[in-house]
Amino acid sequence: MEWETVIGLEIHAQLNTKSKIFSAASTQYGQKPNSQACAVDLGLPGVLPVLNVEVINKAIKFGVAINAHINQRSIFDRKNYFYPDLPKGYQISQMDRPIVGEGKIEITFDDQTKIVGITRAHLEEDAGKSMHDMFDDDTAIDFNRAGIPLLEIVSEPDMRSAKEAVIYAKKIHALVQYIDICDGNMQEGSFRFDANVSIRPKGEKELGTRTELKNINSFKFLERAINLEVERQQDILEESGSIVQETRLYDSVKHETRSMRSKEETNNYRYFPDPDLLSVEISNELLEKIRQTLPELPTQKKARFVSELGLSDYDADVLTLQKPLADYFETMLEHHASNAKLCANWIMGELSASLNKHKIDIQNSPITAQALSLLISRISDDTISGKAAKDVFKAMWNSEGNADEIIQAKGLKQMIGMGEIEAIVEQVIANNARQAVQFKLGNDKIFGFFVGQIMKLTAGKANPKQVNELLRNKLF
């Protein structure tokens, strides 16, 4: 039987505020356990939550960016459940009236444009963190994360493959960084996924029983986890079994999913409005003010790169998918380099390869955008060849100096004088008269032999374009 996969994502984006959603405690990452948890975060008796207004503004900003409906009257609810890292016995979230209502995101997959619906985006507080590896027989709990503001972005079940889900997740990841509401740092847990996965016979309309995959913090793991779950469900159904609606944990080390608990329905959480918090009233003036603060969005930047800079759709898509990458590219253009295509090629080629090899983010690259732009300009003005530029790049990566200093020190400057190159071309042709005759008789492959001999005699310093031009003139 042929199966169709149905996927919806719940993305948890930590909002980049300095204090927590309902307390003044710091949100700084990596501090000593339980050093940033105040009485409100710990749910101690007699304390009351105070809403951080900045989280409202950031949620609205996201909603405006995706052209979503904004609920101008929004309320907070208590989501009741027991877990050791939830000290109050409930989580403050939003159920019936979230800040952000229906919206949509456009993705491109296999050269096809597709709309993924967004059901809602609601605010909630994060829970603490259970730490199982600190003690042999006990679990420790760090409440520093408790109360961190989250924007949970819930999609419609519109995706039909793991690859589609990853493309959508990357779009959201780029967007929250561009509008500066989340740093998107997945290593620190600032951007996490839950995936709701089901399958059904191809052509059927009714959805299958879904499972929720948790503990996913990278695009690679998201794709792996979904594919693994799809295979598991197919195996069960093809053996006449039935899928259990449950929450499953993805283990990236063992590459498996395992059951955590049966999947709760909404009524299991006994949602009700939080009596300690007033409703949030959003004025038209505030909406317009936030709309005016929106920066150039990824889709807009991509369109500009294509129309104004002449980049291909693919190149523009790659460069705009991560804000730091787009910023690096534009900084290059602001300095020495003016050839946008050449800049793009070097960022996506040599630079990306080196960053990936050394597992470094572009923000921490040892070669700054200004430094790389100088190297690109030396290629553009024919000071060095493309081959020599790769040697200069390696030296720059190893902090041996800037492009001009390395070119000078290594003697990599090309021979610019046509007269000097012409003399060498004539010498090579004279020394290889038999090959010259073969070329004139139609053996085009001999041309590469002549180029190689010339580059050898010039130690690679001859300008390849000038060599080709002179060689063709002399041979013909």
Curated annotation (Swiss-Prot):
Keywords: ATP-binding, Ligase, Nucleotide-binding, Protein biosynthesis. One of its GO terms (biological process) is translation. Its EC number is 6.3.5.-. InterPro entries: Asn/Gln-tRNA_amidoTrfase_suB/E (IPR017959), Asn/Gln-tRNA_Trfase_suB/E_cat (IPR006075), Asn/Gln_amidotransferase (IPR018027), Asn/Gln_tRNA_amidoTrase-B-like (IPR003789), GatB (IPR004413), GatB_C_1 (IPR042114), GatB_Yqey_C_2 (IPR023168), Gln-tRNA_amidoTrfase_suB_CS (IPR017958). It catalyses: L-glutamyl-tRNA(Gln) + L-glutamine + ATP + H2O = L-glutaminyl-tRNA(Gln) + L-glutamate + ADP + phosphate + H(+); L-aspartyl-tRNA(Asn) + L-glutamine + ATP + H2O = L-asparaginyl-tRNA(Asn) + L-glutamate + ADP + phosphate + 2 H(+). Belongs to the GatB/GatE family. GatB subfamily. Allows the formation of correctly charged Asn-tRNA(Asn) or Gln-tRNA(Gln) through the transamidation of misacylated Asp-tRNA(Asn) or Glu-tRNA(Gln) in organisms which lack either or both of asparaginyl-tRNA or glutaminyl-tRNA synthetases. The reaction takes place in the presence of glutamine and ATP through an activated phospho-Asp-tRNA(Asn) or phospho-Glu-tRNA(Gln). Heterotrimer of A, B and C subunits. This is Aspartyl/glutamyl-tRNA(Asn/Gln) amidotransferase subunit B. The gene is gatB.
